[in-house]
Amino acid sequence: MLNPTKSLPLLLLSWWLVGCGTTAITNLTPSRLPRKDNGQYPFAVEWNSRQQSLVKDSIKAYVVVGLDQYPMQRTPMLTNRWETLVPVPADKNIVTYRYKFDYEYLGFANRKLDSKLSKYYQLFILDK
């Protein structure tokens, strides 16, 4: 059995690592949008992470619709928000999508790759 005095630092370290690795993906895309003549719809997302080892300049965001991935760009003034336009065929009324973030983090000897996926969301396209 572990000595409580020796196990306390280990417990604190694991609690600290879990707290520092928290990531939140917030969908900023409305759930309903009017149909657009050009078929391009805006998608936006916010990423917040407390992971200390995260290499912030390495983050790449995507909107994933089916098997297609649409790259997103960071918004100019807010470094934790991304946006893009996604084409939706005129015959579709519902788009099921999720967000994907690829990024690097600092490992013990070098950088390592990781990825996070959001839950699924739906966009309802309303006819005018």
Model-derived features: positions:
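Sec-dependent bacterial lipoprotein signal peptides
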Residues: 1-21
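Glycan-association/targeting regions that enable binding to alpha-glucans and other polysaccharides
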Residues: 20-128
